[in-house]
Amino acid sequence: MTDTSTQNTATPTDEYGAEIHPKHSFSPIEKTVESFGKTFTLEVPETEIQLDDSPTGPNEPVRIYRTRGPWAEPTKGLEGLRSEWIEARDDVEAYEGRRRNLLDDGNRAVKRGEASEEWKGSTRPTLRAKEGKRVTQMHYARQGIITPEMEYVALREHCDVEKVREQVASGKAIIPNNINHPESEPMIIGNAFTTKINANIGNSAVTSSIREEVDKLRWATRWGADTVMDLSTGNDIHTTREWILRNSPVPIGTVPIYQALEKVDGVAEDLTWEIFRDTVIEQCEQGVDYMTIHAGVRLPFVPLTTKRVTGIVSRGGSIMAGWCLAHHKESFLYENFDELCEIFAKYDVAFSLGDGLRPGSIADANDAAQFAELKTIGELTHRAWEYDVQVMVEGPGHVPLNMVQVNNEKEQEWCGGAPFYTLGPLVTDIAPGYDHITSAIGAANIAMGGTAMLCYVTPKEHLGLPNKDDVKTGVITYKVSAHAADVAKGHPGAHEWDDAMSKARFEFRWHDQFALSLDPDTAQAYHDETLPAEPAKTAHFCSMCGPKFCSMRISQDIRDAFGDEIDEALATDQKQSLVKDLGLPGFGRQSVDGIDSLSAAGEEEMAEEFRRAGSQLYLNRDEAKEVAEDLQKEAAAHGER
């Protein structure tokens, strides 16, 4: 069979061929590893941000997590990064696979006789596990095998590879990497690692085209999406997914019940296990890395939703609830879950066990229906682990702030610590058009408490299908939430990024501030609205305060005038009485113990010196010299005492 994965790739000529800021550069980490008797050189992407010098000396570059770029032309697709790794394990086989039919692309494709724009780029043999084999990263981890995927992840996360293997083996983290999506760069989802974000894209019956969805994919990953879900429900579902997979450097997730429903012309009661199973295999063969399966929506749970304000708001959940009621039978997803596990184990597809009964309003948060489903999901998680299949668990939804953390607690208790993946949650229902904000508040809160991945919400939530600009807004908003949680949890490198920004801000290094921003374009555009000239990029003020009222400039002047004396006072005072009495931390991020700070007496002494100087924020050179001499005399006298 012919593998055309490395043919015809080229650097794109559009905006995706450039870094998001001139100070950014692609700076990969390289490592040579041995795996299954073969040697591989890993090249793990990172962005290096060059910084200008400070008045006190040079600044080290800041390195941040990224996906690889620039990418190939979208009509040709990406190279198969993992193809050789998969082949080296010698536990997969190529086979013909199911024959694609036009109904896979929907009824309109059947009428046209073809999809609207067939994929003509790179193609590969379809792979599956050999008879009796399991090819999941969890299986390898449980056998004590460290794969190139695990090595790659460890370099990305700046951690020991054994930590990665142990977390995957225990089910507390997943590496979603279908063997038929070798273009994807290994990444890990788990509470012990950096918080990840997912971006949803996909067409609907009334809007969007294949090219638009591919552009959304590239745009989302450019701005930092760690995974992308294709939630297409309109035309050309199969072909749209093929274009997306062949161009995606990140894992792709789907909700296969959407496509299965299209195959029965949108009539939920006409769904069958056979149609759903065929759809799942179709998507496994294409390379989908994780699938949302609403197997926790069971017939006995549906009546629990009748008293809700907003009922069942999950599309997948409502489809399965409708099927259960129409047939008065248990869900075919729940009944056939073990067969799904067997299928997923052949391709290394991860479960994203869907919260089909999640609350759609804060009035319905944490009710019996939601938690009955979550407990069932816990049961299914442990069943999937028996097949070495990776699992993450989906969570709400709409939850007021005071009720958020119990969701983490119940998920950890019932689901054995499997990664939690939540949609927000939105913490209030009153802000249509701003639900990226209402949800980002809940997202930061729940991630701080242990959630591993956050599904973004765009400004169009509840209002319409997001466009390209909405996708970027959603991604950046959720990068803020994820990073804030990482800072709170103390993940390596998280605080250093903030510190670099704070230092650049205090030193008025405007270009560095833009470069260190999650969205450099917007940061610079806002600055330049009022101060567009290049000299303003070195000015020690912005348009908010102007030159006379900039607090940071005033602080710098104080340091210039009193810096040596302040340092000496900090070095000689060991009592920290005021700080200790108040139970406050000392200077810096360490505890009070062992940290020098100003005592109450020292503070009064410095305040008196400030008053003696005429309570002036600014002193000329002679005045500053006179004050410094007085301070030195008093310090000497204090030392003699």
Curated annotation (Swiss-Prot):
Q: Which cofactor does it need?
A: [4Fe-4S] cluster
| Binding annotation for substrate | N200, M229, Y258, H294, S314, R315, G316, D355, G356, L357, R358, E394, Y421
Alphabetized UniProt keyword annotations: 4Fe-4S, Iron, Iron-sulfur, Lyase, Metal-binding, S-adenosyl-L-methionine, Thiamine biosynthesis, Zinc
Q: Which reaction does it catalyse?
A: 5-amino-1-(5-phospho-beta-D-ribosyl)imidazole + S-adenosyl-L-methionine = 4-amino-2-methyl-5-(phosphooxymethyl)pyrimidine + CO + 5'-deoxyadenosine + formate + L-methionine + 3 H(+)
Q: Which GO terms describe its cellular component?
A: cytosol
Q: Which domain of life is it from?
A: Bacteria
Q: In which pathway does it act?
A: Cofactor biosynthesis; thiamine diphosphate biosynthesis
Q: How is the cofactor bound?
A: Binds 1 [4Fe-4S] cluster per subunit. The cluster is coordinated with 3 cysteines and an exchangeable S-adenosyl-L-methionine.
Share an example GO biological-process annotation for this protein: thiamine biosynthetic process
Question: What InterPro entries is this protein classified in?
Answer: ThiC, ThiC-associated_dom, ThiC/Bza_core_dom, ThiC/BzaA/B
Q: Where does [4Fe-4S] cluster bind?
A: C542, C545, C550
User: What is this enzyme's class at the first EC digit?
Assistant: lyase
E.C. number(s) listed in UniProt: 4.1.99.17
Q: Name one GO molecular function term.
A: zinc ion binding
Q: Where is the composition biased (Polar residues)?
A: 1-12
Q: Where is this region: Disordered?
A: 1-25
* Positions with a binding annotation for Zn(2+): H398, H462
Key word Repressor present = no
Task performed by this protein = Catalyzes the synthesis of the hydroxymethylpyrimidine phosphate (HMP-P) moiety of thiamine from aminoimidazole ribotide (AIR) in a radical S-adenosyl-L-methionine (SAM)-dependent reaction.
Question: What family does the database annotate?
Answer: Belongs to the ThiC family.
Q: Which HAMAP family match?
A: ThiC (MF_00089)
Q: Name it.
A: Phosphomethylpyrimidine synthase
Q: Which organism is it from?
A: Corynebacterium jeikeium (strain K411)
